[in-house]
Amino acid sequence: MWFLLFAASAVVLPPFLYLVKTSLTVPRPGQGTEIGLDNYARVAEIAGWDLWVVTVAFAIGASLLAVLLGASTACLVARTNVPFRQVVFVGAFLSLATPVIVKGIGWILLLGPNNGLVNNLLREWFGIDGTPIELFSLGGMIFIEGLLFTPIAFLLTLPALSAMDPALEEAAAMAGARWPRALLRVTLPLARPSLLAVLLLSLIRALESFEVPLLIGIPGGVQTVTTALYQTVHSGFIPRYGEASAYAVLLVIAVALPLSWYYRVTREAAKFATVTGKGFRPARIDLGPWKYPCALWVLTIPVSLAAPLLIMLWASFLPFYSGPSPEDFARMTLANYRAVWARDDILAGITNSLLVGTGSACAVAAAGLMMGWTVARRREFMRWAIDVVASLPLVFPGIVLGIAILVQFLDLRFIPIYGTVWILIFAFVVQFMPYGMRFCHSGVLSINRDLEDGAYMSGARYFTVLRRIVLPLASPAVVATWIYVFMHAIRDLSVAILLSGPGNGIVSIVILDLWNNGEVPQLAALSVLVAVGAAVLGIAFMKLTATHRLYG
């Protein structure tokens, strides 16, 4: 299995080594370059502590909001008889599939200061002057990021809450505790490791967030580390790759701290086990008269997906967008949908997305199966080494991975993939390798090893066993991996934005360009089509993971 370890190392390690090298490389006019900490000093001088304070405040606020909404919804769905449970579950999965940039722009159309639907209604109904809801602010960023991560927090918390023995809550009820007290004093404390783990993952996600700070933070003059990194490359006549790499290295360190704490928390989760060998009958707490008020709370997840998509759908039928009004019904047209299929830049973005999504999904599924099989079956050093190498990209935010691969292939000019779809495929293979390995590892664990041993005893070689035994039996995990990678590769912005050029832009880049150019109706039409396609993939992924329990 040495070839597998070598191949994984050759793909994963060089981008990060080049990133560190670039951050320490200081150009001297007329003297070439030398090694030093000048880039870090320059970053500290420009940004100071304010940038990090804003970034941390944004991350903490968004993660707390996401866990509050997601965990409380999961608690109600898993432990009570609240209505619309299936609607919430489906809405959470579809929200995962919908591109962040689509939802982010949708929320701007809803809550924007000038033509936002909600602000316009508040001004009209209550006679408010100015801007009732200031979206382009740190508070607006926290609100939108928290809403965007709520479905993930819900899905991650739900399994732990669903598996709890209801006898503990029944004992609390017999002691006179009403259902709110039982949930707060019994259920949630037992789920503490899961809640803390989800909080840490939410914190990591918010630290890495790029789309929300780009769309909402920059117009409001609020900058985080990710947008500072982006502007270091894209502002000015000469990209400052050294300073951008310094930002990236510091962000990796910031992400690594909560990630290491997350692994520690999950290792200690056995202390809070409530599922034992003793059988129990799942039971739900009767909410009584609070049943339907609680239903409004759990509908936060499907509504947070439907609201931005509905305003996008509305805008897609208008010749120009200036805020919804009754007069819009007379102006509705399908011209924007026809224009989507007539524009060369949009068609090129769709084609590139399909190529990048297919290429990266096939590569990750194949590599993930081999690595997952090796980690599941091998022992000692090889298992540990492949697991560590394949998991390294988890530490690197998307924007960091983008700058790392950018500086790598700017230096390796003899590999001419910069500015092509191949550099995007390479980037997404690196980014999603940990997820592919873990999905396929779960699938391989369900296969009895005797089947493989029998094939080896019959004279079959490694690749024969992989092709004839492991692949057919682990095919649900492989297909789920393929769908997951394809679905995320075509929607990603943070990795692609630094690696895309005139010839290799994908759909997310096209949507951002349309937004920057003020072409809202055509942007909305494209976003609706992308959301429909993402929904189909999301439903397929949900069916596979639910049927074969690949996410649990």
Residue ranges and their predicted role:
Residues 112, 211-238, 324-330, 493-520:
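Glycine-rich helix-loop "coupling/hinge" segments at transmembrane-helix boundaries
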Residues 168, 270-282, 451, 460, ...:
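Short cytosolic juxtamembrane segments of multi-pass membrane proteins
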Residues 47, 238-240, 344, 518-519:
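Short helix-adjacent coil turns
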Residues 1-28, 43-162, 190-211, 215-217, ...:
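Membrane-water interface segments at the C-terminal ends of transmembrane alpha-helices
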